[in-house]
Each structure stands twice: as structure tokens, then as C-alpha cells.
Amino acid sequence: MLGIGAFKQRIPRPGEALPGREQALPLHNTHLINGHPLRGEFTGLAQVQFGLGCFWGAERKFWKVPGVYTTAAGYAGGQTPNATYSEVCSGQTGHTEAVLVVFDEQAVSFEHLLRTFWESHDPTQGMQQGNDVGTQYRSAIYCTTQAQYAAALASRDAYQQQLTAAGYGAITTEIGFPAPTFYYAEDDHQQYLAKHPNGYCGLGGTGVSCPIGLDA
């Protein structure tokens, strides 16, 4: 029988993941900072999912960007439906901690968001981010349009050149299209660092500038 530690560096195969549940976790559907809904159809707005380590600090990075309509913490990219935080932390769901970013393309470009993403963490660390180790901390971009996907791949290649010049290794970010189902995290994780100003934030970038989105 596999122990929990077996999934710190390996995504569970089909049949190994926890079963999850049909019912979504309870959610207070109002953003603590801007009052916008966390869940909805978001007609006329664009969406993307970013994974860049612990979602507490990651969500704050994006809710501060002008033009972002709403953000939410959640789980994506794995197999377990409606997983809980403890289940995701076990490594047995296949999910990474992710942030749903809903934004107005007339107010902020996707390239600007990509630059924020790349510069806010170290995308070369594989199944960890700083001291946070496990598949749930892997770097990821889950795109909702083909144009986003192309832009994300191009930005990865451009940033790889800068990272290589600075002595970093290969980018390990998972870039996918279409985006997988985004499962909202428990209420306490939503806008966590606004509720807990002295809460943990392990997010740290490389200090290497990303050459895209400079004029956005």
C-alpha cells in the first residue's frame, strides 16, 4: 500500500486518487476585497487559472492587479472532484493549488497577467515552491482559449531565455488547454491573507524580469 509520501513528487495514476464527492464545498460567494462574486458565468469577461505555489499569497498577487474582476482560491489539474484542503495536501488528488482569475481584457491584457505570474514565483522547481514541497505546489497555467494557450507558451519560451541567462534551469510549468474543472477551496482559504494579514506567504520570485506585458 502506498503511503502519502509517495505522492509528494508524483501525480497519482488513475485508480490511486481519492474519490472525492459530488457536492461542491460550501462557498460564501462574495469577494472580501471588491465585493464581486467568486462563482458565476462572468459574461463578457475572460478567465484563466494560475498555479504558483501556496494559493494564499498567489491569490493576493492577482486581486491587486487593476482590471482583475475577481479571484478565487481552489484546486485544479487533478482527478478528485470537490477535494478538500487536507485531501489536496495529501498529494492523492493530483490537484495543484490554483487561483481563478477573472479579468476584463479591455482593462488588463493577458500578457500583463502572465508577467505577474512568471515574476511572482520560481517556475523551475518542479513539484515544490520554496519550502512548500508536493505536487499540489507545482507551477501551472490552465487556459480557457486557444489564444491564451499560444500566448502562455510564447511567454514561457521568452522567460526561459531570461532565466537561462541568469543561471536557472528549465521551466517546469504545466501549461494546458482547455482548462480543467476549477474546484473552489473552502471559505477560509478565499482571500486568506486579507482575513489573516500576518498569515503565511511562501511566495517568492527569482528576481528575473519577464520581457512581456511591459506596456500593459
Curated annotation (Swiss-Prot):
Keyword flag Oxidoreductase: yes
GO cellular component term of the entry, any: cytoplasm
Keywords associated with the record: Oxidoreductase
GO terms classed as biological process: cellular response to oxidative stress; protein modification process
Top EC group: oxidoreductase
Active site: 54
MF GO annotations: L-methionine-(S)-S-oxide reductase activity; peptide-methionine (S)-S-oxide reductase activity
EC number: 1.8.4.11
Family: Belongs to the MsrA Met sulfoxide reductase family.
Described purpose of this protein according to its UniProt entry: Has an important function as a repair enzyme for proteins that have been inactivated by oxidation. Catalyzes the reversible oxidation-reduction of methionine sulfoxide in proteins to methionine.
NCBIfam families per record: msrA
PANTHER family with a match to the protein in the record: MITOCHONDRIAL PEPTIDE METHIONINE SULFOXIDE REDUCTASE (PTHR42799:SF2)
Record's protein name: Peptide methionine sulfoxide reductase MsrA
Name of the encoding gene: msrA
